[in-house]
Amino acid sequence: MTRVKRGNVARKHRNKILNLAKGFRGAHSVLFRTANQQIIKSLRYAYRDRARKKRDFRKLWIARINAASRQNNISYSQLINQLKTSNILLNRKILAQIALLDGPVFSQIVMESNS
């Protein structure tokens, strides 16, 4: 088998990894091996946290709706149940935005769901 000189290919590969590791702390942005390990770890974190972000936002929306609904003397679960039974099709994201930015409109929605 003939010898393959990988000078350019290996350097290009290492530079690609080191460019991805820009902004990392300490040796993680300078040394190839630690940078490579950190890149793998950071990609894993990014994948995991893309799913976690959806959970966290849903939790935040529910907390905001719950706080606003309790100001209107109704619990979150009762409000959601009444919205479903009265066929008011507002998702949690929109309800949370209304509760945060426009309290009187949220109170009207609660009143509509009661009737």
UniProtKB/Swiss-Prot annotation:
Main location group: plastid
Coiled coil feature spans: none
Gene Ontology cellular component annotations, sorted alphabetically: chloroplast; ribonucleoprotein complex; ribosome
Top-level lineage group: Eukaryota
PROSITE patterns assigned: RIBOSOMAL_L20
Protein family (similarity comment): Belongs to the bacterial ribosomal protein bL20 family.
Name of the protein in its database record: Large ribosomal subunit protein bL20c
Organism: Mesostigma viride
